Amino acid sequence: MIPGEYQLQDGEIELCAGRERITVEVANTGDRPIQIGSHYHFAEANPALIFDRDKTRGYRLDVAAGTAIRFEPGQRREVTLIPFVGRRHVYGFRQAVMGALDEKGATS
């Protein structure tokens, strides 16, 4: 092996295999593009994006880590989301959760 060399497996690699997935339609009603990153808590996305926020609580984009999806002004599209896993604690973003996603009485 050469330092820094990649040894890749042949074929396709499925990201997040076996995870529950949901699809939501999203519309950008703003006048500027909006980009959402791979691990952003989707329910807390820019208010100019119109979609069912309650349905997306605890979910993030089903895209490769470090990538994003861009919504152009006036654009409407479907996106696939997957749930956060692990401890399911969310902090920051727009500060709508600030703790455990599954906590009783928690709102976003």
Swiss-Prot record:
Belongs to the urease beta subunit family. The keyword Hydrolase applies. It is found in: Cytoplasm. Signal peptide: none annotated. HAMAP family: Urease_beta. InterPro entries: Urease_beta-like, Urease_betasu_sf, Urease_subunit. GO terms for biological process: urea catabolic process. This is Urease subunit beta. Its EC number is 3.5.1.5. CDD domains: Urease_beta (cd00407). It comes from the Bacteria. Heterotrimer of UreA (gamma), UreB (beta) and UreC (alpha) subunits. Three heterotrimers associate to form the active enzyme. Pathway: Nitrogen metabolism; urea degradation; CO(2) and NH(3) from urea (urease route): step 1/1. One of its GO terms (cellular component) is urease complex. Keywords: Cytoplasm, Hydrolase. One of its GO terms (molecular function) is urease activity. Its main location: cytoplasm. It catalyses: urea + 2 H2O + H(+) = hydrogencarbonate + 2 NH4(+).
